[in-house]
């Protein structure tokens, strides 16, 4: 069984990190797949996001970090992953993620999506929110790992 946790991670938040750590305890191994989304202009380029994630996950030896573009289901197929992990912060996330899960299932019937609820300490977090707070000089050390905090502060100087 191979588990795929996809996302843009622009940037990685403590919510993402918590989900990865919890999934690693449950499943043992996990592939974090960083999307190069050509329809968005990211704050950090793909290479920088991968470095941020690897730095933040160095204490977890069973986590592999890769990049991909295109459909998540195609990435899962290429890796022979049969489970896609998604985090849920609120009911609105569930509605969106369920639609994506059904789409992925329609493209590959062997792919299942597993949902983990977000730790309540991080249920308010989103990458967009973190960037907004950082942009206006707010404190983000409780929202993101240290290397991401430094990168965001440098970016918004």
Curated annotation (Swiss-Prot):
One of its GO terms (molecular function) is pantetheine-phosphate adenylyltransferase activity. InterPro entries: Cyt_trans-like (IPR004821), PPAT (IPR001980), Rossmann-like_a/b/a_fold (IPR014729). It catalyses: (R)-4'-phosphopantetheine + ATP + H(+) = 3'-dephospho-CoA + diphosphate. The record marks 16 as: Transition state stabilizer. Reversibly transfers an adenylyl group from ATP to 4'-phosphopantetheine, yielding dephospho-CoA (dPCoA) and pyrophosphate. Substrate binds at residues 8, 40, 72, 86. It is found in: Cytoplasm. It is an enzyme of class 2 (transferase). Its cofactor is Mg(2+). One of its GO terms (biological process) is coenzyme A biosynthetic process. Pfam families: CTP_transf_like. Belongs to the bacterial CoaD family. Its EC number is 2.7.7.3. It comes from Prochlorococcus marinus (strain MIT 9301). One of its GO terms (cellular component) is cytoplasm. ATP binds at residues 8-9, 16, 87-89, 97, 122-128. Homohexamer. Pathway: Cofactor biosynthesis; coenzyme A biosynthesis; CoA from (R)-pantothenate: step 4/5. Gene3D superfamilies: HUPs. The lineage of its organism: Bacteria, Bacillati, Cyanobacteriota, Cyanophyceae, Synechococcales. Keywords: ATP-binding, Coenzyme A biosynthesis, Cytoplasm, Magnesium, Nucleotide-binding, Nucleotidyltransferase, Transferase. This is Phosphopantetheine adenylyltransferase.
């Amino acid at each position: 069984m191979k588990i795929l946790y996809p996302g843009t991670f622009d940037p990685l938040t403590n919510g993402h990190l918590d989900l990865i750590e919890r999934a690693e305890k449950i499943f043992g191994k996990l592939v974090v797949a960083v999307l190069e989304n050509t329809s968005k202009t990211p704050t950090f380029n793909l290479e920088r996001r991968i470095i941020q994630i690897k730095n933040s996950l160095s204490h977890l030896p069973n986590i592999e970090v890769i990049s991909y573009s295109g459909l998540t289901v195609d990435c899962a197929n290429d890796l022979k992953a049969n489970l896609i992990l998604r985090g849920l912060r609120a009911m609105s996330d569930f509605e969106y993620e369920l639609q994506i899960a059904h789409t992925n299932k329609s493209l590959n019937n062997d792919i299942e999506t597993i949902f983990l609820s977000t730790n309540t300490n991080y249920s308010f977090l989103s990458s967009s929110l973190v960037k907004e707070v950082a942009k206006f000089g707010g404190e983000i050390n409780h929202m993101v790992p240290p290397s991401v905090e430094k990168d965001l502060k440098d970016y918004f100087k």
